[in-house]
């Protein structure tokens, strides 16, 4: 993609758990990204992207900053965003379902909640 379109590539890593194997997998993938000059960043997400599930952010706590961007996703909400940013110190946060309106029996009322978005932004800026 990078060679043809000349756009930055962001690699995604799905974090499944907190075992030694998970930590080793994260370390190996991070090393691969750091060695790849075409990769602009790495996105850490939960084991099932889009499911709104968090993972143990402490697994990323000691990642050293480099010129690669660190993206954090997976179950972020206004309530946990400040702790996530404090623990991981990402360059970018990714939120979707965490700022949606509460479940409504009518699909016509689904969508993003402006108050939740405002609170989320306030909390990640702390």
Give, region by region, the residue ranges found by the protein language model:
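Conserved anion-binding
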Residues: 1-73, 77-80
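Compositionally biased, intrinsically disordered low-complexity segments
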Residues: 4-7, 91, 120
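Conserved, mostly hydrophobic/aromatic
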Residues: 42, 56, 60, 84, ...
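Glycine-rich phosphate-binding active-site loops on the catalytic face of alpha/beta enzymes
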Residues: 47-49, 87-117
């Amino acid at each position: 993609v990078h060679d043809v379109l000349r756009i930055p590539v962001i690699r995604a890593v799905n974090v499944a758990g907190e075992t030694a194997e998970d930590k080793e997998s994260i370390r190996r993938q991070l090393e691969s990204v750091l060695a790849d000059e075409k990769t602009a960043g790495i996105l850490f997400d939960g084991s099932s992207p889009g499911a709104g599930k968090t993972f143990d952010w402490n697994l990323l706590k000691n990642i050293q900053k480099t010129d690669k961007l660190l993206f954090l996703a997976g179950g972020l909400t206004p309530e946990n965003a400040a702790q996530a940013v404090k623990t991981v110190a990402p360059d970018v946060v990714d939120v979707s379902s965490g700022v949606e309106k509460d479940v409504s029996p009518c699909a016509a009322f689904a969508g993003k909640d402006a108050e939740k978005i405002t609170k989320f932004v306030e909390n990640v800026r702390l």
